[in-house]
Amino acid sequence: MKLRNGSPEDAGMSSGRIRHVERLVQRWADTQVSQAFVTVIARKGIIVSHQAAGTASPGPESSPLKPDTLFPLASITKPITATAAMILVEQGLLSLSFPVSYYIPEFVGEGKHQVLVHQLMTHTSGMRNNEIGEHSRQKEALVDIPPADVNQHPMIHKRLFLGYDAPLWKPPGTEMSYCGYGVELLGEIVRRVSGQTLESFCRDHIFTPLEMNDTYFTVPEALYSRVIRRPEDAPGGRWYHTPEAMSSPSAAGGAYSTALDIAKFGQMFLNKGMYGNERILGAPAVAEMTRNHIPHISSTYGAQFFKEASYGYCWPINHNKKDSGDLFSPKALVCGGAGGVNITIDPHYDTVQVIFSVESKSNDGHNVWFPCMNLFNNAGIAAIEA
C-alpha cells in the first residue's frame, strides 16, 4: 500500500471534522501562533488532508508557505537511523546484542564494554549528554583531532572522537536518559559496517524505495531556498538555515524533509515494512522496533521523572507519557524534533499524523507550539468515524 489522496469518508473519517482541523491550523497561522504549519493526516493509506498555512519566512514580505517546504527533522532523524541499523541486522551484518566496542574499538572507559548496540536506540546506554558534553569540552583543549575517514563528515568525526572515552553516567540498562550521542554512535556503526556514508545507505535502502525524494542529510545548495526560514530568536533560528546545518549529516538530528515524505516513512511502519511493492523492513524487524524494550526501567527527561519508560528502537511509545495528544492508543509511536516537528503513528487506528511548524514562545516565555501539536493530533483522531 502506498499513500494516496482520497476523501475522509474513504478512510472512515468525517469530512466536516477534517475541515475543522484545517480551519484550526489556518487560524493558528493567521493569528501568528506560529509562522508556518504543514500538516498531513492519513488513515488506511489514504491522505485526507495535506495543508500548508502561513509563510515561508518571517516578516510581511514573505511568500506563502508551500506543502513541499523542507523542514529540519531534528530528532525525527533518529528512527531513520535506527531503520538503517535494522536493515543491516536483517542482512546479517549487525547484531544489536553485541557491545558497541565490537564495532567501534575506540569506545573505551570503565564499564563501556557492557554497553550494547540496542541500548543506543533505547537511550539506556548509561551515557548522558551532560557528561559527554563536559568531557568533550575538556578533551578538545588538550588533544589534536585526528583526520576523518574519507567517507566521514569532519564535524561528525570530531564529535564522536571527543566523546569516545567519556565516562558513563550510570551502569548500562539501569535508567533511560535521552542521549543524542548514542544515536551518533549508531550512525557511525552503520557507516563502518556498510562501508557507505549514512546518507548514501539511507538513500539506497530507505529514501529511494519509499519515494522520499525530498529527504536529505545534506541539502543540495540548489534547494536551500526551499528550507523554512524562522525568526532568529526562535529555537534553532540561528542554526537550521545555515550551510553548516544543512550539510551536517548527523545521525541524531541532521536530516531535512517534507511532511509528506515523513508521512510515507510512517506509513511503511503501519504496512509492516512494505511500501507499495517495496519491502524496506521485514515484519519481525518492524515489530521489534515498535515494541517497548524497557519495561520497569525509569526515565529522566529534562526535569521530568517517569517511574516506567516506554521506548522502542528510537521510537517513543505513547504508553504513559501523553504529551502529543490525548486520544491516541497506548501503542502509538510519537516522535518529535526540536524546532517544531512531530509525527505520530497509531497502529490501532491505522493513522499517520504529521505536523511541521516553527516552534515559538509567547511573550511570557511559554512554548506555544507544543499545545498546537497536542490539539492538532486530538482533532485529527477525533475525525475517525468507523
Where are these regions (language model features)?
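Short, surface-exposed loop or secondary-structure junction motifs
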Residues: 2, 111-331
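Short, gly/Ser/Thr-rich active-site loops of penicillin-recognizing serine hydrolases
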Residues: 271, 290-301, 362-386
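Short, well-ordered beta-strand elements
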Residues: 343-344, 350-360
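Short glycine-rich, acidic/polar surface loops and turns
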Residues: 331, 336-345
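Short, conserved phosphate/pyrophosphate- and ester-handling motifs at nucleotide-, phospho-/glycolipid
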Residues: 14, 78, 258
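Short, conserved catalytic-motif segment at the N-terminal edge
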Residues: 6-73, 95, 239-241, 381
